[in-house]
Amino acid sequence: NAASREHPCRVIVVTPGDRLADKARLDAQIRVGRDAGANEVVVLRLSGPLAGHASSVVTPFLLPDTPVVTWWPDVAPKVPADDPLGRLAIRRITDATNGLDPLECIKSRLKGYTSGDTDLAWSRITYWRALLTSALDEAPHEPITSALVSGLKTEPALDILAGWLASRIDGQVQRAVGDLKVELGRPRATTTPS
C-alpha cells in the first residue's frame, strides 16, 4: 500500500476459472480504498470459452495513456510478447524460477526475446553482479582467467550469472551444483566474495 501512494495505479488480476465449463462466465471484484491502498484493484476470474479471450476482457479496464505491464507470477508463455495479454503491454515480466524446467524457460525466453521482456531471474543477480564487480577493486589486481558459479541446479539466476561472467571475462566459466558460491580465478589467487 505504501508504494501505491507514491505510484498510484490500476492493477488488473486475471485468474483462470473453470476453462472446461460450457458457459462463458466472468466473476469480477473491484477493490478500492483501504484494501488497495491508492490503487484500484480489479480481479477477473474467466471461465468457459471466455477464458481464451482474456485480452478482450481486460481492454475496457485499461486506463488511457497509462503504461501497461503484464506479469506472469507462475508459468509464463514461451514468447510473452506474442501472448494476447503480453501484446497489450510495454513491459512483460516473467519468472523462470517458477517454470516446470527453469533452465529451459530461460533458453526459450532468449529465443523469443522482445524489447520490454524482463525475467526476475536477472534481477536476482543484481547484488551478485555488484559484489563481483567490487571484488575487482581488491588485490590482486590481475585479470580474471576463470570463474566457478555454484548453487542449486533449479535456480536459473545462477545460470544467468554464469552467462554474464562468460560474456565479461576472457576465460572459462564453470556452472556447478552445490553450495552457493562464486569463485573468480586469477593467475596468483582465487577470489571468493562473501
Describe every region a protein language model picked out.
Residues 1, 7-9, 164, 174-194:
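C-terminal structured domains
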Residues 1-71:
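An N-terminal, globular interaction/scaffold subdomain
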Residues 4-13, 62-68, 87-93, 166-177:
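Structural alpha-beta junctions
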Residues 21-25, 80-81, 104-105, 156-160, ...:
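Short, solvent-exposed polar/charged micro-motifs at secondary-structure junctions
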Residues 25-34, 86-98, 183-193:
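Acidic, Ser/Thr-rich peripheral helices and adjacent loops at domain boundaries
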Residues 38-41, 64-65, 88-91, 143-144, ...:
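A broad structural signal for short, well-ordered beta-strand segments within beta-sheet-rich domains
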Residues 45-133:
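Internal, hydrophobic cores of structured domains that mediate oligomerization or house catalytic pockets
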Residues 120-175, 180-182:
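ATP/pyrophosphate-binding catalytic subdomain of soluble kinases
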